[in-house]
């Protein structure tokens, strides 16, 4: 039987091809734009923050104030490190060109490493160790971010050393678990080893759950799954608010600090995605989607998203992309793209390439690194979102 194709049929085929071609071209153009923005943001970070003194370290902010430390604290450094890691995953040779820079960041990162601590375990101090500084108290959340970055690098490269360091960090973090049953809401991982704080935070528990789940996926060791469940359950019991979002922290008397930061919503999204992956229980995926929906609605009101620090939003959006890798809902990528577009147009100084998202004349390393991460990840192929936090 012969098939007859009418003129209108031919036109329909040509039109569909044209639409597909236009869509593909638009996606490619968007990726190129994000790629260029990531590179420009990184170049500004290096130009204004990187210390060309052989230390492999950075400034805390630009312009520096007279009383500033010589180098940045560990948390900002780690985000510059992660920004560089994200750049190595840009398509083609562009990503590969950042491998020497990533090696440089790895050297700098180790200047914060301390072989001892309050719980007897090694980890990253909050400030560089001698000869670059005198170290500082360990923060469990700061260490968790590095652990998650090491997992990302392991998934990208298979480097066994990064996996080994992630395991060390996890051991440190769970050593910070509150074991005093006389405390209000006993349990939970403390925020820091510093003597001036005894808070147990969403951000010192949920990222550890995320790290534990990643380690369980890689090793199959139920030790990691057990701790992930323990920290997840404690946070849900004590810091999950009636609006479906998470409060910041709880003190030893049971008083709750009820600020709802964006990164404290993003990480639980990622944790639930990983629980779904390791258990196959769709309840976890539904929880992830519910938190994401509630967060996007909450931060979409009253310009709230732009009152959140960029370095909280980068973590928030990366976890939404991890959710997208599981449910294929592109609204998360669209929301991240819209945020990136607005920050680029509204809060960036085109003369310097620096961001001023808080309206001040100073740019922090945290801020610049966060926006570099956002543009870099948006330039990735969407199938790569599954390696994010």
Where do the language-model regions lie?
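Bacterial N-terminal signal peptides that target proteins for export
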Residues: 1-11
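Bacterial N-terminal signal peptides
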Residues: 9-19
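Boundary at the C-terminal end of the N-terminal hydrophobic targeting segment
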Residues: 26-28
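CBM-like carbohydrate-recognition segments
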Residues: 30-83, 87-141, 200, 260, ...
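Short coil/turn linking the two alpha-helices of tandem helical-hairpin repeats
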Residues: 88, 92, 154-158, 216-220, ...
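Extended ligand-binding groove/face enriched in aromatic
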Residues: 99-218, 226
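Active-site cradle of extracellular carbohydrate-active enzymes
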Residues: 202-208, 212-216, 223-272
């Amino acid at each position: 039987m012969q098939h007859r194709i009418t003129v209108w049929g031919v036109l329909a085929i040509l039109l569909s091809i044209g639409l597909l071609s236009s869509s593909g071209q638009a996606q490619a153009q968007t990726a190129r734009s994000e790629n260029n923005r990531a590179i420009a943001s990184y170049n500004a970070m290096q130009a204004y923050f990187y210390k060309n003194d052989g230390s492999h370290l950075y400034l805390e902010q630009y312009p520096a104030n007279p009383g500033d430390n010589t180098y940045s604290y560990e948390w900002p450094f780690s985000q510059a490190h992660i920004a560089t890691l994200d750049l190595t995953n840009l398509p083609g040779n562009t990503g590969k060109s950042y491998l020497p820079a990533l090696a440089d960041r790895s050297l700098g990162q180790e200047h914060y490493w301390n072989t001892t601590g309050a719980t007897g375990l090694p980890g990253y101090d909050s400030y560089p160790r001698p000869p670059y500084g005198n170290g500082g108290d360990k923060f469990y959340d700061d260490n968790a971010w590095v652990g998650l970055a090491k997992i990302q690098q392991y998934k990208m490269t298979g480097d066994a050393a990064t996996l080994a360091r992630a395991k060390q960090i996890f051991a440190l973090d769970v050593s910070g678990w509150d074991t005093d049953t006389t405390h209000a809401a006993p349990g939970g991982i403390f925020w820091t080893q510093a003597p001036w704080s005894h808070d147990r935070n969403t951000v010192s528990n949920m990222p550890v759950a995320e790290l534990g789940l990643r380690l369980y996926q890689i090793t199959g060791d139920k030790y990691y799954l057990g701790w992930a469940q323990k920290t997840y359950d404690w946070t849900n019991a004590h810091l999950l608010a009636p609006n479906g979002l998470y409060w910041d922290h709880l003190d030893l008397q049971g008083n709750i600090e009820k600020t709802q930061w964006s990164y404290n919503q993003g990480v639980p999204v990622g944790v639930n995605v990983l629980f779904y992956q390791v258990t196959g229980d769709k309840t976890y995926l539904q929880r992830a989607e519910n938190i994401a929906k509630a967060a996007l609605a909450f931060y979409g009101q009253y310009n709230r998203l732009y009152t959140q620090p960029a370095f909280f939003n980068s973590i928030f959006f990366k976890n939404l992309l991890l959710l997208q890798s599981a449910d294929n809902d592109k609204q998360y990528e669209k929301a991240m793209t819209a945020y990136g577009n607005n920050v680029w147009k509204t809060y960036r100084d085109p003369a310097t390439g620096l961001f001023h998202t808080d309206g001040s004349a100073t740019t922090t390393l945290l801020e610049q690194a966060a926006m570099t991460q956002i543009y870099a990840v948006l330039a990735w192929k969407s199938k790569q979102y599954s390696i994010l936090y």
